[in-house]
């Protein structure tokens, strides 16, 4: 979890244009993901002005300032240019008013821009800051992208998680993280997992050591991060434990405030775990699209029992 994001990093990661204040990019930081679009502030009402937020100007805001005199624009911009304001951000590649550039220069505030529409730019910056500023936790497991689904493979040490991930990579799927997965909540329904920088693209295989998946299999075999859609827990087979054979039992595991579907796969000699997990991901996708093989089987079984009962009567 980062406490803040510098304007320099924001410009680099989101490929923003710098109109002015390039010398202040490193020192200016933002600590909130919320963005402010000035409204009443442009009329001179500054009660509850969120000076600590990025100030976003779109077509509406810029055109409104054009109806002011130069003196009025300069006065308003100077009041908005608090020393704690991270930056002024302008959408649609609009030309910033001269008074904005002057007030920003006086207060050491960068003026940034983008060719995106105001709504898209707002969403892009908010999502980016949410990801950078979100609380992070570490989980033990392996995260793999299987057919576009983020599958977190968990289980006791030595159960075969990394070996299974290696087989999945050979089958064309993509590795995100091995051994340690850093997770954060992106929104109310989404949890994202990524690898720590030092472990990125690396996989540890007992007896072989550490391998670099990207160098061995190419850039298409790895991803930086992915949302976690399914948890597959590998558990050593036990005769004393009952396992779900129909897939009717639904489990969930809470990660932050998000319930993530979970299935338990018993590990036994001779079972191809990579194929099992691959099929589990495909089956999960089918269920999310409205087809449930278990419910179909139960419905057909019910019809058969009902038909046999009618024949006996």
From Swiss-Prot:
Record protein name field: HPr kinase/phosphorylase
Organism: Latilactobacillus sakei subsp. sakei (strain 23K)
EC number: 2.7.11.-, 2.7.4.-
Role noted for this protein: Catalyzes the ATP- as well as the pyrophosphate-dependent phosphorylation of a specific serine residue in HPr, a phosphocarrier protein of the phosphoenolpyruvate-dependent sugar phosphotransferase system (PTS). HprK/P also catalyzes the pyrophosphate-producing, inorganic phosphate-dependent dephosphorylation (phosphorolysis) of seryl-phosphorylated HPr (P-Ser-HPr).
NCBIfam families: hpr-ser (TIGR00679)
Cofactor requirement: Mg(2+)
Family affiliation: Belongs to the HPrK/P family.
Region (Important for the catalytic mechanism of dephosphorylation): 266-271
Domain remark text: The Walker A ATP-binding motif also binds Pi and PPi.
One Pfam family it belongs to: Hpr_kinase_C
Residues of the active site: 140, 161, 179 (proton acceptor), 245
GO molecular function annotation: ATP binding; magnesium ion binding; phosphorelay sensor kinase activity; protein serine/threonine kinase activity; protein serine/threonine/tyrosine kinase activity
Coiled-coil stretches noted in the UniProt entry, renumbered to this chain: none
Annotated gene: hprK
Protein's UniProt keywords contain DNA repair: no
Binding partners and assembly: Homohexamer.
Region annotated Important for the catalytic mechanism of both phosphorylation and dephosphorylation, chain positions: 203-212
Positions contributing to ATP binding: 155-162
